[in-house]
Regions:
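Positively charged, Gly/Ser-enriched RNA/tRNA-binding surfaces
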Residues: 1-51, 97-247
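Short, conserved phosphate-binding/catalytic loop or strand-edge motifs used
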Residues: 17-22, 58-66
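Hydrophobic mid-domain F-helix/FG-region of cytochrome P450s
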Residues: 41-47, 63-70
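Short, surface-exposed recognition loops or helix-turn segments adjacent to catalytic cores
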Residues: 53-63, 81, 159-163
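Short, solvent-exposed helix-helix connector turns and helix-capping sites enriched
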Residues: 60, 88-89, 119
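Short low-complexity, flexible loop/linker segments enriched in glycine and/or proline
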Residues: 70-72, 174
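Acidic, His- and aromatic-enriched active-site or binding-groove loops in soluble protein domains
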Residues: 73-95, 102, 154, 180
Length: 247
């Protein structure tokens, strides 16, 4: 746990916001088991905070990246497309795609990304839109992850968004955010970033999340949640030179 200083709001550009965050990382494991462990931990954290009505929305950036690669879109156009899809700006996406000389079949799939969110049915729909192997592999991983979450009874907390992207270009696989009512921003964000550590040395498969404690507490307050705290225990007070006896 620690304080972070970052500007994540489009309404306060140029101003840093201090917030308290807590999170976890799993490094050195690129398996779907690691994805499951981190997503389950996110759900456990939200449940332990007393939240009952919340959703963890999961996407996979490899679906989008597969389409970009096939269409040959990169540079400024790719960055603009990320922003527009992330904002669910359907008409902005349409205008940009119309200005590019790309295969209409790929363009049609990209145009649907702002609307490809919801239940597990979204994944089945997306799988029928393309034959791109990278895209289908991304869908397959999400389907398998959902099957595992269903086994442990956590599927009721899960929804999907294939338009879930990030201006942080380091995400390499699944990406997720946790939402609950009472606050207008995610309580938790995270995803897989297998190439990030490599910028500081050697590549290590990594997945993790960060939970905004301030946003979580605001949600708990507005939902009038009162989480019992165990205050039982013994307070041991001792002088500096009496540590051995205190132990």
């Amino acid at each position: 746990m620690g304080n972070t200083f970052v500007n994540v709001s489009k309404y306060y550009q140029g101003k840093l916001k201090e917030s308290t965050a807590v999170g976890a990382e799993l490094i050195g494991d690129d398996s779907i088991d690691a994805d499951l462990e981190i997503i389950s931990m996110v759900i456990d954290c939200m449940k332990n905070a007393g939240l009952e009505e919340f959703q963890v929305e999961i996407g996979n950036v490899l679906f989008f990246k597969g389409l970009l690669k096939e269409a040959g879109i990169d540079g400024d156009e790719a960055e603009m497309l990320v922003r527009l899809i992330e904002q669910k700006n359907y008409f902005g996406v349409e205008e940009l795609l119309n200005s590019l000389n790309i295969d209409k079949r790929i363009s049609d799939v990209l145009l649907q990304l702002p609307q490809l969110f919801g239940s597990i049915n979204v994944l089945h729909k997306a799988a029928g839109l393309t034959k791109n192997q990278d895209c289908l592999a991304a869908i397959d991983r999400l389907l398998k992850l959902y099957d595992y979450l269903k086994i442990i009874g956590y599927d009721k907390y899960i929804s999907f968004d294939l338009g879930a992207l990030s201006n942080h270009g380091y995400y390499t696989g699944i990406i997720f955010a946790g939402y609950t009512f009472g606050v207008g921003e995610p309580v938790v964000n995270g995803g897989r970033y297998d190439k990030l550590i490599g910028q500081f040395g050697c590549d290590k498969a990594s997945i993790g999340f960060s939970m905004n404690v301030d946003t979580l507490m605001a949600a708990m307050n507005r939902q009038k949640l009162n989480v019992p705290v165990d205050v039982s225990g013994i307070l041991l007070v001792y002088a500096k030179d009496n540590l051995v006896n205190a132990l």
